[in-house]
Amino acid sequence: MKIVVAKNIGFCFGVERAIRTVEELLDEGKKVVTDGEIVHNKQVMEQLTKKGLKVSSEMTDGEVFVVRAHGIPKDRLEELKKIFPEVVDLTCPIVSQLFKTAQRYAKERKVIVFGKEDHPEMVALRGYAPAIVTKVPFKFEEKKVVFLSQTTSSLEEYKEFVAAMIRMNEFEEAVFLNTICPVTVNREREVEELSKICDLSIVVGGKHSSNTGKLFRIASKHSKTIWIESPDELPADVVKYGTVCVFSGTSTPNSLIENVVRKLKEMEGKRDGTI
């Protein structure tokens, strides 16, 4: 079995920044709270809660409130500043830029965002601008629109959505902006190419992670693909595949990927009788 690990793996800079900041605050002995997953990865969240991070939607007691990488609605942010002595905004800079862009364009045209309506990033965005969030093309009466995208969406799926919207409607002015994170686009392109040479693609990342799900869908077009959160989820028959490729979402730590590769080698060794 040949194991090929993608070049673009591990945390993106926004996730790394968020986790590092929370760990530093906890190491300082501060009582840190938040209202949801800092990042969409179960193992990372377990590690942070073990260190003392408190997660609750009802939490009002603490020294420091940390805003998740996905952001929160503007009004909610202002409320939190009145409740907590310190609020640390860990919204990914690329996500923050999306919010500002939506807010600016909403003054002159209708904002249509390609994304998951219930995703935390989209919930936060609607706190900055009255946007329509959907992944399904629809008929629309407004003549002036701007198209934006959730930062973790597939670029190709976003383009297909916009093309369908233009075919279905008669817009007088339609602005198309690529607001997808370039880090996720690079991973998307690598998975698109590398999965073509794989007998099995393994995508490692949280099951609630939008960008990990995107990579799973892309790899599935070209090879047998599984999506796992931990090495324990590797199926016994993984050793029957000739070339196995390993990919990861942007919320997946390098240590987890290393553990998956180690487990694959152990499974291969047991099959060959070398372990």
Swiss-Prot record:
Q: How is the cofactor bound?
A: Binds 1 [4Fe-4S] cluster per subunit.
Which GO MF terms are attached to this record?
4 iron, 4 sulfur cluster binding; 4-hydroxy-3-methylbut-2-enyl diphosphate reductase activity; metal ion binding
Please state the pathway this protein functions in, per its UniProt record: Isoprenoid biosynthesis; dimethylallyl diphosphate biosynthesis; dimethylallyl diphosphate from (2E)-4-hydroxy-3-methylbutenyl diphosphate: step 1/1; Isoprenoid biosynthesis; isopentenyl diphosphate biosynthesis via DXP pathway; isopentenyl diphosphate from 1-deoxy-D-xylulose 5-phosphate: step 6/6
Top enzyme class: oxidoreductase
| UniProtKB keywords | 4Fe-4S, Iron, Iron-sulfur, Isoprene biosynthesis, Metal-binding, Oxidoreductase
Question: Which residues participate in [4Fe-4S] cluster binding?
Answer: C12, C92, C181
Q: Which cofactor does it need?
A: [4Fe-4S] cluster
Q: Binding positions for isopentenyl diphosphate?
A: H40, H70, H119, S209, S210, N211, S251
Provide the residue positions that the database annotates as binding (2E)-4-hydroxy-3-methylbut-2-enyl diphosphate. Answer: H40, H70, H119, T151, S209, S210, N211, S251
Task: List the active site.
Answer: E121
Coiled-coil intervals, chain numbering: none
Annotated residues for binding of dimethylallyl diphosphate: H40, H70, H119, S209, S210, N211, S251
State its Enzyme Commission number(s).
1.17.7.4
Catalytic reaction(s) noted: isopentenyl diphosphate + 2 oxidized [2Fe-2S]-[ferredoxin] + H2O = (2E)-4-hydroxy-3-methylbut-2-enyl diphosphate + 2 reduced [2Fe-2S]-[ferredoxin] + 2 H(+); dimethylallyl diphosphate + 2 oxidized [2Fe-2S]-[ferredoxin] + H2O = (2E)-4-hydroxy-3-methylbut-2-enyl diphosphate + 2 reduced [2Fe-2S]-[ferredoxin] + 2 H(+)
GO terms, biological process: dimethylallyl diphosphate biosynthetic process; isopentenyl diphosphate biosynthetic process, methylerythritol 4-phosphate pathway; terpenoid biosynthetic process
Function in brief:
Catalyzes the conversion of 1-hydroxy-2-methyl-2-(E)-butenyl 4-diphosphate (HMBPP) into a mixture of isopentenyl diphosphate (IPP) and dimethylallyl diphosphate (DMAPP). Acts in the terminal step of the DOXP/MEP pathway for isoprenoid precursor biosynthesis.
Family recorded in the similarity comment: Belongs to the IspH family.
Per its record, how is this protein called by name?
4-hydroxy-3-methylbut-2-enyl diphosphate reductase
Which source organism? Answer: Thermotoga sp. (strain RQ2)
The protein's gene is named ispH
